[in-house]
């Protein structure tokens, strides 16, 4: 599958391109400000994973499948080897691609996720999103309010409803999901999990970035990380939650630029 991509690049980019992968229910556009800051002297691509953003809808949310989509897209766009950054679910996709196609990945940046199974906390939210009566909802804010029983944080509810857009069909004009929500909901067991070829590891430069206020990377995960990526550096960004790039964009960009410079990736 060829994925939708947002590309930013100077006239004469140098060094390997930087590729950005979003998390569950995110989209390439979420990296907008960060992507602009990182695209000085370097080609930077942000991809919509399958069933997200403007990419095609298709069943199958296994990480091997998602990684293959990214591989095919990077090959089509002549964007490998690359420095591959993934946030949350996108981080697991990035790790799997680095294991399956290590020649594609010059360096790996994983944001607030570890290579392990996570609890199924999102399943009730996905079901509530599927139950929304979009024929009677006229705005994203109204849809977000309707999800308050399953998600208390208004910022998270706004994030969950960013995949809604105005559509027009025989029943008239109303809101509809731009994303493949049913495919995502069915794929949650795969998204929550993690599988990799036995004994596989990525031996290139790697940075794992955690938010200090996020529970997603725990102390006991450090061994899992270094087993998978023996060269992994681990950094924690103060005052950042799970959405590290949104909470602390300046620190996020600085950490990436420091890693790239130290890894010999600089233009």
Name these PLM-found stretches.
Residues 1-19, 39-43, 79-80, 170, ...:
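Alpha/beta-hydrolase fold catalytic core
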Residues 135-196:
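Conserved alpha/beta-hydrolase catalytic His-Asp/Glu region
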Residues 6-12, 32-39, 45-86, 254:
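Active-site loop/oxyanion-hole signature of alpha/beta-hydrolase fold enzymes
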């Amino acid at each position: 599958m060829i994925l939708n991509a947002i590309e930013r690049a100077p006239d004469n980019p140098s060094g390997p391109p930087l590729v950005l992968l979003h998390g569950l229910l995110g989209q390439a556009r979420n990296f907008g400000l960060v992507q602009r800051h990182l695209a000085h002297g370097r080609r930077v691509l942000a991809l919509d994973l399958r069933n997200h953003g403007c990419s095609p809808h298709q069943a199958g949310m296994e990480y091997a499948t998602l990684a293959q989509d990214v591989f095919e897209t990077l090959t089509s766009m002549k964007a490998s080897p690359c420095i591959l950054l993934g946030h949350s679910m996108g981080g697991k996709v990035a790790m799997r691609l680095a294991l399956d196609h290590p020649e594609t990945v010059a360096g790996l940046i994983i944001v607030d996720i570890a290579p392990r199974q996570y609890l199924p906390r999102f399943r009730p939210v996905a079901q509530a999103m599927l139950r929304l009566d979009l024929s009677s909802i006229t705005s994203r804010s109204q849809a977000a309010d309707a999800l308050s029983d399953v998600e208390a944080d208004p910022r998270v509810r706004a994030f969950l409803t960013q995949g809604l857009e105005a559509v027009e069909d025989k029943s008239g004009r109303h809101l509809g999901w731009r994303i493949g929500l049913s495919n995502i909901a069915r794929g949650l067991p795969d998204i929550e999990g993690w599988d990799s070829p036995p004994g596989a590891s990525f031996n290139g430069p790697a940075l794992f970035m955690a938010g200090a206020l996020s529970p997603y990377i725990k102390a006991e995960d450090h061994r899992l990380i270094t087993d998978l990526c023996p060269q992994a550096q681990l950094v924690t960004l103060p005052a950042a939650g799970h959405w590290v790039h949104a909470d602390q964009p300046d620190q996020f960009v600085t950490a990436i630029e420091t890693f790239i410079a130290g890894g010999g990736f600089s233009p």
